[in-house]
Swiss-Prot record:
Binding locations of substrate: 296-298, 352-356
Organism this protein belongs to: Bacillus subtilis (strain 168)
GO BP: proteolysis
Catalytic reactions of this protein: Acts on substrates that are at least partially unfolded. The cleavage site P1 residue is normally between a pair of hydrophobic residues, such as Val-|-Val
Segments on the Cytoplasmic face: 1-71
Note: Inactivation results in compensating overexpression of YkdA, especially during stress conditions.
Domain of life: Bacteria
Protein name as catalogued: Serine protease Do-like HtrB
Catalytic residues in the record: 187 (charge relay system), 217 (charge relay system), 298 (charge relay system)
Keywords: Cell membrane, Hydrolase, Membrane, Protease, Serine protease, Stress response, Transmembrane, Transmembrane helix
Residues that span the membrane, as ranges: 72-92
Main location: membrane
Amino acid sequence: MDYRRDGQNDQHQTEPSHTEQQNTENQKLIGHSEQELLDAPVSYEAGRQETASALEMEKQETAVKKEKKRRAAWLSPILGGIIGGGLMLGIAPYLPSDQNQATETASANKQVQSDNFTTAPITNASNIADMVEDLEPTIVGISNIQTSQNNTFGTGGGSSSESESGTGSGVIFKKDSDKAYIITNNHVVEGANKLTVTLYNGETETAKLVGSDTITDLAVLEISGKNVKKVASFGDSSQLRTGEKVIAIGNPLGQQFSGTVTQGIISGLNRTIDVDTTQGTVEMNVLQTDAAINPGNSGGPLINASGQVIGINSLKVSESGVESLGFAIPSNDVEPIVDQLLQNGKVDRPFLGVQMIDMSQVPETYQENTLGLFGDQLGKGVYVKEVQANSPAEKAGIKSEDVIVKLNGKDVESSADIRQILYKDLKVGDKTTIQVLRKGKTKTLNATLTKQTESSSS
């Protein structure tokens, strides 16, 4: 199934940011390349390209499916760009569009977890029209402006010009003195040379990118607080129940349809989907809703019956024969990431420092004859192609041609499992155990995790 972000720029390909330099363009570092991405990963970029070509309203919402190509040479590090077909990211290229918002009925008594968020429910939430009117000032449209090179004859030089690459939505969650802050999706702002924000009253502000995180697909923007009169209240997504009514407010297909409201229910909780990002394929925990989510909705809020934000709209299934499958990032997952982005401009994560290939991609004869595996050892874990110098993996004693079968006590079947454990269960500075198979023998190694950098793999 193809998952795509609601709003995404056309310019950024979903390749891992830790791509091995000497490899071909479609090769990925193991840390970010998973070949058999369970049900084919959702691609932010796929969504961009689709919404770009799909600017002809709903008809063009059919997801552009990218077929994952399997390389004949299994030794190539994980294929770059396994993109499933059908998940659409809500960025509308050129035309602003980002309406993937659903309403959530989160508990009005949510405990305050951060000073950056307010939690009071809207007093007039019993009437949807009144609630929407109250929330409208907190919803914004976001335009991603990028520079393109004009070189008609390919002779070098030429001129450059700025153009709108894509649009999305966002929600104002904090006002501090003369500044206001907006939550949106990373794929809405990725690659921008300039970001502009359109407020509910039509006023336009130039926005500053405070921080963004590819893995969670979240970003925080800063604008002048001069024209900001209200901030959105956040609810407790852990209190949601399937069947609760929700609404989505956003800008499907651009500012032309700004402030569009759609209604639905929470169709499912704690859904896990694979998403192909510039950091590789990652698993996302999302809320499922049947509220209409169209290109341009990405980054907009999903709102409960109390008028509180319980999710940030991010993805929808765009596949022939499939309707009303939209996904939002739960508010309880959003808040801690936003806190880090406000404080540091980024999210620090641990890494091992290895390039890997899923064992499902390694020929059985190679597993037996070269790696020395046998019996139930065959086909398990991830193959270590290369170990980075001075990395936690090297210091722990991991070697090329080892097969990692457990990390932090959990079974490993794919590189996605490695990332999931690293990003969800562990943090920088943690000590952990790694179980490997080496020439048919099991070894348990100890590693101390360090900070992931732009040039480091998983």
